[in-house]
Amino acid sequence: MEVFKALFKSKEAYTVDVDPMKDSDEHDLPRDPLSIRVTGEEEVNHIPYPYFDEIPTEEEMKKKSAEFYKSMKKRRTVRKISSEPVPLEVIENIVRVAGTSPSGAHTEPWTYVVIRDPDLKKQIKEVVEEEEQLNYARRMGEKWVQDLSILKTTWSKPYIETAPYLILIFKQVYGIKPDGDKKVHYYNEISVCISCGLLLAAIQNAGLVTVTSTPMNAGPRLRVLLNRPQNEKLIMLLPVGYPAKDAEVPNLTRKPLEEIMVLK
């Protein structure tokens, strides 16, 4: 605790921003060190690692890792998504996988908002496209727009309505304790990004497709539309479904192993 007293010398009380269109950030956390909950190992019951009997042999490990890579290298960004229904159980299992992700101090600072209501999807599309038109016209710059045009990316996002499900991933900038006080969420953005990676792998494993969308400047409006609290900030929007019959993807290649891995 002495370390935290040194780091947080200010005793001034925190205030809650009353503007619903402004996302919270770490500056909204309490500055009093005594209000920060520190979780020590002595507070968590530890048990022996329970999965020793499931560790594969080296040959099995090689096979499993190769098969997983074979599946994942087929993952592509797909912008034409079919409206064909997907069982809700599949989506729930995909989100469960994302929820197994590690997080700073086990705070699990993520919220996955799953949308299947057509009217709500339409409203989300209207918000995103309105902001995207401004992004492409003014905010992004000519070079950025040119780089995206090579991939046939525009402000139009029809997949938001056609996909049977949308998954909006929010990071919890801080937590709320039962008594209403704020709780630090360490490395919240890194934690949520790791979770998003597992989510994408789970989508691919289920045989579905998506496109990673980060709706620039639309986050606060979508948070308010979805009635999410101010301590949450939109990180990513994923339409999820089957590829449409006329779906196309850029004919791209990925960097070889020798360009992405360094062995010392």
UniProtKB/Swiss-Prot annotation:
It holds the Pfam family Nitroreductase. The keyword Transit peptide does not apply. Gene3D superfamilies: NADH Oxidase. Its EC number is 1.21.1.1. It comes from the Eukaryota. InterPro entries: Nitroreductase (IPR029479), Nitroreductase-like (IPR000415), Nitroreductase/BluB (IPR050627). Its cofactor is FMN. It is an enzyme of class 1 (oxidoreductase). FMN binds at residues 75-79, 103-104, 212-214, 254. One of its GO terms (biological process) is tyrosine metabolic process. Belongs to the nitroreductase family. This is Iodotyrosine deiodinase. It comes from Nematostella vectensis. The lineage of its organism: Eukaryota, Metazoa, Cnidaria, Anthozoa, Hexacorallia.
